Amino acid sequence: TRLSRYLSPPLFPVLIRDLPCKLTLHEIANSKFSIGPFKIQSGYVIHPGPTVGFRVGNGKSVFTYIPDHEPALGEKGIIPDKRWISGYDLAAGADLLLHDAQYTATEYLSKKGWGHSSINDAALFASLASAKHVLFAHHDPFHSDAQLNDMFTVFKNENPYPFKNELAKEGMLINLD
């Protein structure tokens, strides 16, 4: 499987068959299924390689996970019509949305089509989807923590979105009902 190729040397130090667990893999793109009390919807999102986002709900709250996503459509940017926005159905009304925000708006100009989002496009996507709380993730590995904090401060000062938004950080815990 594709996952077996990624979870093997040289990309990953351990072979998938050597993991200390009973692992069952399923193809789940563009599907709906349940695991215990959780209803899960998966769907392809715009990215050069096959990439899936997830919507997980428990009847009380919804968490949407879209880590690799470019919602803008080239020079047109984000078309504010939910029928044309990749990932919209996954993110609509989410209580918590974790979304790709790898670039600043300026950096994104030279990286269109790479499959990642600017923080500005991620915020616009979240706003159009009426997400309540957004975690900006998939930070550019060339940005230091200090640079990320500075970039986020500039973004917040220039973009007063009505939803709660913050940078995703290692070790964060967020409670959903």
Model region roles, listed by residue range:
Residues 72-164, 168:
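Cap/insert and terminal regions of metallo-dependent hydrolase folds
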Residues 1-77, 87-88, 145-177:
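Binuclear metal-dependent hydrolase catalytic cores
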